[in-house]
Amino acid sequence: MSAPLTLALSKGRIFEETLPLLAAAGVQVAEDPETSRKLILPTTDPNLRVIIVRASDVPTYVEYGAADFGVAGKDVLVEHGGSGLYQPIDLNIARCRMSVAVPAGFDYANAVRQGARLRVATKYVETAREHFAAKGVHVDLIKLYGSMELAPLVGLADAIVDLVSSGGTLKANNLVEVEEIMSISSRLVVNQAALKLKRTALKPFLDAFERASQNGN
């Protein structure tokens, strides 16, 4: 019997919003990663298992063949690189946007016009660097791993670059969006070798995911 396919997912919103896609393929994950300590989860299909990894690590697991396919946000693929991966489907899940936000009352447009050098906190350093360089904005980028909204409140940064869904967290911390960098959704990513060597096993999942994503799950 051949080894099962391995699907790489991250905990949280991507995992939850991938479940209906798996259901469309007739598959359920046997355990909840929020309550289970296991990082390799069986499914109701003996030919598929799910591994739970950090969101930023999904492309790496897939690129090097530790997973045959996975689900990764556009933010992760742009920041960490997805050029070595086949990206056949925009799954239209985990939708949000990457934006620049500043404290309410801070005149961002005027600061940019005057050529001010801004300190910007973000975990998306490469994406932010490219964005500001393209606009000719002078910035010092500060790498953080979480709680971006805190940085302007304590004087660490003038602005942040982060993902925004409803904007509720920004509003609660007296921050406002001033610029959208890109729209974000999650993509299916597939290992290039697996696509050739395991195409027969992969195809039912790819087809089911594509149908479900087009039909709004």
Curated annotation (Swiss-Prot):
UniProt cross-references to Gene3D superfamilies, sorted A to Z: Periplasmic binding protein-like II (3.40.190.10)
Primary subcellular site in the record, as a coarse category: cytoplasm
Domain of life assignment: Bacteria
PROSITE patterns for the chain: ATP_P_PHORIBOSYLTR (PS01316)
Family matches, as InterPro entries: ATP_PRibTrfase_cat, ATP_PRibTrfase_CS, ATP_PRibTrfase_HisG, ATP_PRibTrfase_HisG_short
Any GO CC annotation of this UniProt entry: cytoplasm
Family matches, as SUPFAM superfamilies: Periplasmic binding protein-like II (SSF53850)
Presence of keyword Protein transport: no
Catalytic activity, reaction form: 1-(5-phospho-beta-D-ribosyl)-ATP + diphosphate = 5-phospho-alpha-D-ribose 1-diphosphate + ATP
Molecular function GO terms recorded: ATP binding; ATP phosphoribosyltransferase activity
Localization, UniProt: Cytoplasm
Keywords: Amino-acid biosynthesis, ATP-binding, Cytoplasm, Glycosyltransferase, Histidine biosynthesis, Nucleotide-binding, Transferase
EC number: 2.4.2.17
Task performed by this protein: Catalyzes the condensation of ATP and 5-phosphoribose 1-diphosphate to form N'-(5'-phosphoribosyl)-ATP (PR-ATP). Has a crucial role in the pathway because the rate of histidine biosynthesis seems to be controlled primarily by regulation of HisG enzymatic activity.
Domain remarks in the Swiss-Prot or TrEMBL record: Lacks the C-terminal regulatory region which is replaced by HisZ.
SUBUNIT field: Heteromultimer composed of HisG and HisZ subunits.
Record-linked NCBIfam families: hisG (TIGR00070)
Family of the protein in this entry: Belongs to the ATP phosphoribosyltransferase family. Short subfamily.
Name of the protein this chain belongs to: ATP phosphoribosyltransferase
UniProt organism field: Burkholderia vietnamiensis (strain G4 / LMG 22486)
Upper taxonomic lineage: Bacteria, Pseudomonadati, Pseudomonadota, Betaproteobacteria, Burkholderiales
